[in-house]
Amino acid sequence: MLIELDYPVPLSVELEAAKTLLLIIDMENENAHPAGALYIGEPVRKIIPRIAQLRERIRQAGGRVVHTQSVRSPDALEFAVFKNTVRKLEGTWGAELIDDLKPASDEPLIVKHTHDCFYQTEMDALLTQMELRPGEGRVIVTGISTRNCVQSAVMGFSVRDYHVYVPMDCTAHNDEKQVLQAFSLFTSFGYKHSVTMTRSDLIQLY
C-alpha cells in the first residue's frame, strides 16, 4: 500500500517578540558546510540565509535566540555498543557551528549529547532564567536535521506546553520523505494543538 504525504499549508502568524524564542538547531560544519563529512547539500544551503534573516528580524524586534550544538565523545555508547557512524566528535571542526550562524555574545548555546535538546542539558534552566513560561512562550524551531534533532525539539517543547512554530523553509534533511514524515507527525492529533506549520516570511513580530 502506497501512502502519499503532502507538505502542510504554511500559516501566517503574529508573535509577541518579548515572548518569542528562535531556536537554531545544530547548524554544524559536519552537516552544514560543503567540506563536512556528512554535508546535507542543497537543502541545507538554502536554509542558511533564511535562518540568518529570521534571526536578524527577531533580534531587532526584541526576541531571543538560542543555539544548540550536538557533540559526542569517542567512547559514547552510541558508537561503542550500537556501532552507529562516528560523528560530531567534541572538539573537532565538524562539531563547530558554521561561521554564518555562530552565536552572538548574547545568544546562549546549549550543548547536547543526543538528538534531544532537553536530555541532560541546561535547556530547562535556561527557559526558567529567560522567564519563558509554558502556555505563554513562543518557540520557533529551525535547523537540522528535520527528522532527528528538529523533530525531537518540536516534540520536547510541545509536551512542555509551549507554543511551537516550524518554518518549513528553515529546516533541512537529506531525505525529503523523512521531512514529510516529520511534518506529518507535527500536524497529527498529538501535536497539532500546540505546533503551527509556517514559513519564515509569514512570521510577523510585534
Language-model segments: residues:
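Active-site-adjacent betaalpha module
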Residues: 1-21, 57, 85-206
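Acidic-leg catalytic submotif of subtilisin-like serine proteases
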Residues: 21-32
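Generic enzyme active-site microenvironment
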Residues: 24, 68, 167
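Short acidic, glycine/proline-rich loop/turn micro-motifs
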Residues: 34-38, 78-82
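Short Asp/Glu-rich motifs
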Residues: 70, 77-78, 176-177
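Short acidic/glycine-rich loop or secondary-structure boundary segments that cap or lie
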Residues: 74-79, 118-120
